[in-house]
Every structure is written in C-alpha cells, then in structure tokens.
Amino acid sequence: MSDPLIMDVNPDTPITSDSGFAPEQRAGVLVETLPYIQRFAGQVVVVKVGGHAMDDGDLAARFAEDVVLMHSVGIRPVVVHGGGPQIGALMERLGIQPEFREGLRVTDAETLEVARMVLVGKVNRDIVSGINVHGPLAVGLSGEDAGLIIASARNPELGYVGDVAAINPAIVERLLVESLIPVVSTIGADPTGQPYNINADTVAAALAVALGAERILYLTDVEGLLADTDDPDSRISSLDSAALEDLIADGTVSAGMRSEEHTSELQSRETI
C-alpha cells in the first residue's frame, strides 16, 4: 500500500449545510467535492480530532455532521480522538499538578486513571452521542477493546506514556463491514494488561496503515504545519511520510512538535 495522504484540516470550516455558505456557494462546494466523493467512495478514511474541538459544543456538533456526511456518500470514516484539554481540566479540579516533558504529559498511576476516565468515559461518549443524533451509526472503542492497540512503554521517565507496538484492526474492520463508524480512544494495553496513554496522532497513523486507509485527516485548531514558522501563508496542506521525514531531518519540524512526528513512521508500524 502506498502511504496514506496526510492532511491538516481546520474544523472551523465544515462542509455541512450550516457552515455559513450561501446556497450558490454550497452548490459550488458540492460541485468541487464531487470528484473527491467519487474517488473516496468505499475507501477507509481515518479522521483524527483533538480535544480542543470537543470543547466547543457548536464545533463538536458540526464535526459530527461532517462525519455523518462522509458516511452517507459512501466513505468509511474511522474517528481517532485525543482529549488533552479535558484531561487537564479534570486534573485541575482534582488538585493534581500536571507535568510535561518534550510535549508529553508525564503519566503516573493517578494521572493514567484520570486519562482513562476522560478519554474512554467522557470524550469518546460525547463524540459517539453527537454522531448518533443522526442515526445509530457510531460505536465507541478503547484501544484496550479486543486487543486493538498493543502498547509499549515509551520512556520510564514519562510513566505510563505509551507507543504503539502493534495494531489488531479486526474489531474495527468488523464494524466497517456493518457500515458503522468506529470512534477510537487512545488508551492501549501491553501484553500484561497494563494500560498506557498514547498520543492520538501516533495512533491515527498506525491505525491507518493497519486498515489500508486511503487518507488521514488531521483536524486541528492551530494553523497547521508551516514551512516557515514566521510565515502563516507557508502552511503545508498535505504531505506523505517521506516528505515529513525530510522536514524532521532539516529541522522544519521542531522540538515542540515531537509528539506529532511519529506520523512519519507509517511504514514501520507492525500489524497483527
């Protein structure tokens, strides 16, 4: 399989009927998107959405509408989500002081418990519920379910922060066969059953490879990946894994983006 195409999409510009376009503009959008609909009909598309999008009720609702629209035109979406802001908010309410190293949350046993509660019990439920307003379409999954995400420890100094050791996509594939929309939270477990919190970008990339996805869409509330950090007009809208590796090598991808750069490892992910 060739590398899935990676794209940054700003969720503030959805393609639903409530996006603020005039009727003639919506017609133009549909005409422009028809070739893409035809191209990707029947194909798996992994959609990674960050926790910031879920903090805005209107934005979350429009995201759900867009996922349902993809499904309705024959595309097979698989949603992978993060939940960093929600984890941070609950930790603050509980009086737990967060610690970050190299852009990653240091995760002790207490923090891991909070992350599991938020990702599996809150953010995942909210996304599933938002989609299912439009019909019984979405099914929520944790990476622990059916051995979907086999995790390994990234660095003992980070605690229970994990990497993807392997993906067993069988449960996701079964849901896709049933024309359902899998919604995956990024808690995985090692072979002993120990849970780990894994970066959602990393999971999205690994899952895309395991499923043979045609494309990955990254929805972000930031400007995206810039060829020149001082020039907002230099945003890179799409690239493959080889191009991303080049950007890492020449320093365009900076230390502050290290948690995302694992996306460049698409070809090296092991599947079961």
Task: Give the positions of each predicted feature.
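Nucleotide/pyrophosphate-binding catalytic subdomain
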Residues: 1-268
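Substrate-binding/gating loop at the entrance of the active-site cleft, primarily
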Residues: 272
